[in-house]
Regions:
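Non-catalytic terminal extensions of PLP-dependent enzymes
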Residues: 1-177
Protein backbone atom coordinates (compact mmCIF):
# COMPACT_ATOMS: atom_id res chain seq x y z
CA UNK A 1 0.00 0.00 0.00
CA UNK A 2 1.21 3.54 -0.54
CA UNK A 3 2.97 4.94 2.52
CA UNK A 4 1.05 8.24 2.19
CA UNK A 5 -2.23 9.45 0.75
CA UNK A 6 -2.57 13.19 0.13
CA UNK A 7 0.61 13.80 2.13
CA UNK A 8 -0.62 12.03 5.28
CA UNK A 9 0.45 8.57 6.50
CA UNK A 10 -1.82 5.84 5.13
CA UNK A 11 -2.56 4.44 8.56
CA UNK A 12 -3.53 7.83 10.03
CA UNK A 13 -6.90 7.70 8.26
CA UNK A 14 -10.01 6.11 9.79
CA UNK A 15 -10.64 2.52 8.72
CA UNK A 16 -14.10 3.42 7.39
CA UNK A 17 -12.60 6.00 5.04
CA UNK A 18 -9.88 3.60 3.84
CA UNK A 19 -12.48 0.89 3.16
CA UNK A 20 -14.53 3.19 0.91
CA UNK A 21 -11.92 5.21 -0.97
CA UNK A 22 -9.85 3.80 -3.87
CA UNK A 23 -7.13 6.43 -3.34
CA UNK A 24 -5.81 4.20 -0.55
CA UNK A 25 -5.20 1.35 -2.99
CA UNK A 26 -3.76 3.08 -6.08
CA UNK A 27 -0.51 2.16 -7.74
CA UNK A 28 0.86 5.57 -8.70
CA UNK A 29 3.14 5.53 -11.76
CA UNK A 30 6.74 6.17 -10.77
CA UNK A 31 6.21 5.55 -7.04
CA UNK A 32 9.07 3.58 -5.50
CA UNK A 33 7.09 1.62 -2.88
CA UNK A 34 5.83 -0.98 -5.35
CA UNK A 35 8.54 -1.29 -8.01
CA UNK A 36 6.12 -1.66 -10.95
CA UNK A 37 6.74 0.13 -14.23
CA UNK A 38 5.08 1.02 -17.52
CA UNK A 39 1.46 1.66 -16.66
CA UNK A 40 -0.84 4.66 -16.55
CA UNK A 41 -2.64 6.56 -13.80
CA UNK A 42 -5.64 4.74 -12.32
CA UNK A 43 -4.74 1.59 -14.28
CA UNK A 44 -4.02 -0.66 -11.27
CA UNK A 45 -5.09 -0.91 -7.66
CA UNK A 46 -3.97 -2.99 -4.69
CA UNK A 47 -6.38 -5.87 -4.12
CA UNK A 48 -7.37 -5.73 -0.43
CA UNK A 49 -8.09 -9.49 -0.52
CA UNK A 50 -4.46 -10.24 -1.31
CA UNK A 51 -1.77 -10.11 1.34
CA UNK A 52 1.62 -9.79 -0.37
CA UNK A 53 4.82 -9.79 1.65
CA UNK A 54 8.16 -8.82 0.18
CA UNK A 55 11.08 -10.65 1.74
CA UNK A 56 14.47 -9.00 2.33
CA UNK A 57 17.07 -9.12 -0.42
CA UNK A 58 16.26 -6.45 -2.98
CA UNK A 59 16.37 -2.72 -2.44
CA UNK A 60 13.08 -1.71 -4.09
CA UNK A 61 14.05 1.94 -4.58
CA UNK A 62 17.32 1.12 -6.35
CA UNK A 63 16.29 -2.24 -7.82
CA UNK A 64 19.56 -3.78 -6.65
CA UNK A 65 20.30 -6.94 -4.72
CA UNK A 66 21.36 -6.47 -1.12
CA UNK A 67 24.20 -8.52 0.42
CA UNK A 68 21.78 -10.85 2.25
CA UNK A 69 18.29 -11.93 1.37
CA UNK A 70 15.53 -14.31 2.32
CA UNK A 71 14.14 -16.04 -0.76
CA UNK A 72 10.36 -16.23 -0.46
CA UNK A 73 10.41 -19.92 -1.36
CA UNK A 74 12.23 -20.65 1.88
CA UNK A 75 9.62 -18.78 3.93
CA UNK A 76 6.90 -20.57 1.94
CA UNK A 77 8.43 -23.96 2.73
CA UNK A 78 8.62 -23.08 6.43
CA UNK A 79 4.95 -22.07 6.41
CA UNK A 80 3.91 -25.23 4.53
CA UNK A 81 5.80 -27.38 7.04
CA UNK A 82 3.75 -25.59 9.70
CA UNK A 83 0.35 -26.07 8.08
CA UNK A 84 0.01 -22.75 6.23
CA UNK A 85 -0.19 -22.88 2.44
CA UNK A 86 0.60 -19.63 0.61
CA UNK A 87 -1.12 -18.98 -2.70
CA UNK A 88 2.25 -18.53 -4.40
CA UNK A 89 5.82 -17.45 -3.83
CA UNK A 90 8.31 -16.11 -6.31
CA UNK A 91 11.86 -14.86 -5.81
CA UNK A 92 11.27 -12.34 -3.03
CA UNK A 93 7.54 -12.13 -2.50
CA UNK A 94 4.90 -14.39 -1.06
CA UNK A 95 1.16 -14.08 -1.61
CA UNK A 96 -1.77 -15.05 0.58
CA UNK A 97 -5.40 -14.76 -0.48
CA UNK A 98 -7.79 -13.48 2.16
CA UNK A 99 -11.45 -14.40 1.95
CA UNK A 100 -14.39 -13.04 3.95
CA UNK A 101 -14.39 -16.39 5.77
CA UNK A 102 -10.92 -15.80 7.28
CA UNK A 103 -11.13 -15.49 11.03
CA UNK A 104 -8.90 -13.67 13.46
CA UNK A 105 -7.33 -16.89 14.77
CA UNK A 106 -6.17 -17.88 11.27
CA UNK A 107 -4.66 -14.44 10.66
CA UNK A 108 -2.96 -14.44 14.06
CA UNK A 109 -1.50 -17.89 13.32
CA UNK A 110 -0.04 -16.59 10.05
CA UNK A 111 1.47 -13.51 11.71
CA UNK A 112 2.83 -15.58 14.62
CA UNK A 113 4.43 -18.13 12.26
CA UNK A 114 6.10 -15.38 10.22
CA UNK A 115 7.37 -13.73 13.44
CA UNK A 116 8.68 -17.11 14.64
CA UNK A 117 10.50 -17.60 11.33
CA UNK A 118 12.08 -14.17 11.77
CA UNK A 119 13.28 -15.11 15.27
CA UNK A 120 14.76 -18.36 13.92
CA UNK A 121 16.49 -16.39 11.18
CA UNK A 122 17.87 -13.85 13.67
CA UNK A 123 19.15 -16.70 15.85
CA UNK A 124 20.63 -18.47 12.81
CA UNK A 125 18.89 -21.66 13.90
CA UNK A 126 19.96 -25.03 12.49
CA UNK A 127 18.14 -25.91 9.28
CA UNK A 128 17.08 -29.19 10.88
CA UNK A 129 15.04 -27.14 13.38
CA UNK A 130 13.56 -24.63 10.91
CA UNK A 131 12.75 -26.96 7.99
CA UNK A 132 12.77 -30.47 9.49
CA UNK A 133 11.01 -32.16 6.56
CA UNK A 134 13.33 -30.63 3.96
CA UNK A 135 16.30 -31.46 6.14
CA UNK A 136 15.21 -35.07 6.68
CA UNK A 137 14.66 -35.58 2.96
CA UNK A 138 18.10 -34.15 2.09
CA UNK A 139 20.12 -34.63 5.28
CA UNK A 140 23.43 -35.25 3.56
CA UNK A 141 23.10 -32.15 1.36
CA UNK A 142 22.16 -29.86 4.26
CA UNK A 143 24.24 -31.34 7.07
CA UNK A 144 25.49 -28.53 9.37
CA UNK A 145 23.43 -25.89 7.51
CA UNK A 146 21.69 -23.07 9.33
CA UNK A 147 18.69 -21.18 8.01
CA UNK A 148 20.90 -18.22 7.13
CA UNK A 149 23.27 -20.53 5.20
CA UNK A 150 20.39 -21.73 3.03
CA UNK A 151 19.03 -18.21 2.54
CA UNK A 152 22.47 -16.86 1.63
CA UNK A 153 23.20 -19.68 -0.81
CA UNK A 154 19.95 -19.22 -2.72
CA UNK A 155 20.14 -15.40 -2.54
CA UNK A 156 23.70 -15.50 -3.94
CA UNK A 157 22.42 -17.64 -6.81
CA UNK A 158 19.64 -15.13 -7.52
CA UNK A 159 22.17 -12.29 -7.44
CA UNK A 160 24.84 -14.05 -9.53
CA UNK A 161 22.39 -14.73 -12.36
CA UNK A 162 20.30 -11.56 -11.80
CA UNK A 163 17.15 -13.67 -11.68
CA UNK A 164 14.93 -10.68 -10.87
CA UNK A 165 15.78 -9.19 -14.28
CA UNK A 166 15.18 -12.52 -16.02
CA UNK A 167 11.85 -12.89 -14.24
CA UNK A 168 10.84 -9.34 -15.17
CA UNK A 169 11.79 -9.93 -18.82
CA UNK A 170 9.68 -13.09 -18.95
CA UNK A 171 6.54 -10.99 -18.51
CA UNK A 172 7.41 -8.22 -20.97
CA UNK A 173 5.60 -8.11 -24.30
CA UNK A 174 8.89 -7.91 -26.19
CA UNK A 175 9.96 -11.26 -24.73
CA UNK A 176 6.82 -13.18 -25.69
CA UNK A 177 6.98 -15.49 -28.73
Amino acid sequence: IPPEVDGKPWDSYPTEQIARDLRFFKYEPGAKWHGFEDYGPDQYFVDPCKFLLTTPGINIERGEYEPFGVPAGILAEYLRENGIVPEKADLNSILFLMTPAEDLAKMENLVNRIAHFERLLDANAPLSEVLPVLYRNHAERYRDYTIRDLCQELHDYYREYDLKSIQKAMFRKDELP
